């Protein structure tokens, strides 16, 4: 991977992360029970990755660094949920409903389980 690609990913990721932080700082205090900033980041990312995939599909003349900046960098920094959404919708559009269910179940359940395991690991390490 070249320097331009790395720079594109890094710059996009920084901007995406800053936007996610801004969503959290601005929206999370409005309704503390449901982190609206995270929801806004995930919904925005899902929408934008769909738009980006379609845009880059029809504008293949753009340099690969543009896609890396937008999708891998910016949307990856904003949320990885956008990638999950794009992959799931792709399976749905292909009519692969069983795999769609498996992917949804794996991502959601896996993320929750890993979060719990992470919490438990840190708690265990703090006690030993």
Swiss-Prot record:
It catalyses: fluoride(in) = fluoride(out). InterPro entries: FluC. The lineage of its organism: Bacteria, Pseudomonadati, Pseudomonadota, Betaproteobacteria, Nitrosomonadales. Keywords: Cell inner membrane, Cell membrane, Ion channel, Ion transport, Membrane, Metal-binding, Sodium, Transmembrane, Transmembrane helix, Transport. Fluoride-specific ion channel. Important for reducing fluoride concentration in the cell, thus reducing its toxicity. Pfam families: CRCB (PF02537). It comes from the Bacteria. The chain crosses the membrane at residues 3-23, 33-53, 69-89, 99-119. Na(+) is not transported, but it plays an essential structural role and its presence is essential for fluoride channel function. Its main location: membrane. It is found in: Cell inner membrane. The keyword Transmembrane helix applies. The keyword Magnesium does not apply. This is Fluoride-specific ion channel FluC. GO terms for biological process: cellular detoxification of fluoride.
């Amino acid at each position: 991977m070249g320097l331009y690609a790395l720079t594109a990913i890094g710059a996009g990721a920084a901007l995406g992360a800053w936007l996610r932080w801004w969503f959290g700082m601005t929206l999370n205090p409005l309704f503390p029970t449901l982190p609206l900033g995270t929801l806004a980041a995930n919904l925005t990312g899902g929408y934008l990755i769909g738009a980006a995939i379609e845009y880059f599909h029809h504008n293949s003349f753009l340099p690969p660094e543009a896609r890396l900046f937008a999708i891998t960098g910016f949307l990856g920094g904003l949320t990885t949920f956008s990638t999950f959404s794009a992959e799931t919708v792709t399976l749905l559009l292909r009519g692969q409903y069983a795999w769609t269910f498996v992917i949804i179940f794996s991502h959601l359940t896996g993320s929750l389980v890993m979060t719990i395991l992470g919490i438990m690991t840190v708690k265990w390490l703090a006690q030993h």
